[in-house]
């Protein structure tokens, strides 16, 4: 008497637990999902003015200015130009660079339920 074959595994293999499932176990799906979204989580988690301005300073000044305006429309001008102004990457007059660099950059971002970043001003800095 033969054994019942189900997608390449016999019934006896299923009863002993030696058959290989074509699907990943749940914990592997969760791990892969977390790894896929890790860069986004790190970027949102590190939504500190100085750190994001440093990351944006890697790009050419015209790209970083447009990039920060598109992503963070409520971001104060001093945050998007803080580090690039000090490095001289912006092609603006020296007095304008100095004005950008001297502006204080206070406050934090928070993630709303819609997933948008909003600038939260410190109470003493309004």
Swiss-Prot record:
Keyword terms of this UniProt record: Host membrane, Host mitochondrion, Host-virus interaction, Membrane, Modulation of host cell apoptosis by virus, Transmembrane, Transmembrane helix
Transmembrane segments annotated in the record for this chain: 24-44
Subcellular localization(s) per the UniProt record: Host membrane; Host mitochondrion
Subunit structure: Interacts with host CAMLG; this interaction allows efficient apoptosis inhibition. Additionally, interacts with vGPCR/ORF74 and induces its proteasomeal degradation.
Protein name, UniProt field: Protein K7
Disulfide bonds: none
Recorded superkingdom: Viruses
Membrane topology annotation: Single-pass membrane protein
This protein's encoding gene: K7
GO CC list: host cell membrane; host cell mitochondrion; membrane
Species: Human herpesvirus 8 type P (isolate GK18)
Coiled-coil regions, chain positions: none
GO biological process assignments: symbiont-mediated perturbation of host apoptosis
Function according to Swiss-Prot or TrEMBL: Plays a role in the inhibition of host apoptosis to allow completion of the viral lytic replication and may thus favor the maintenance of persistent infection in infected host.
Main location: host cell
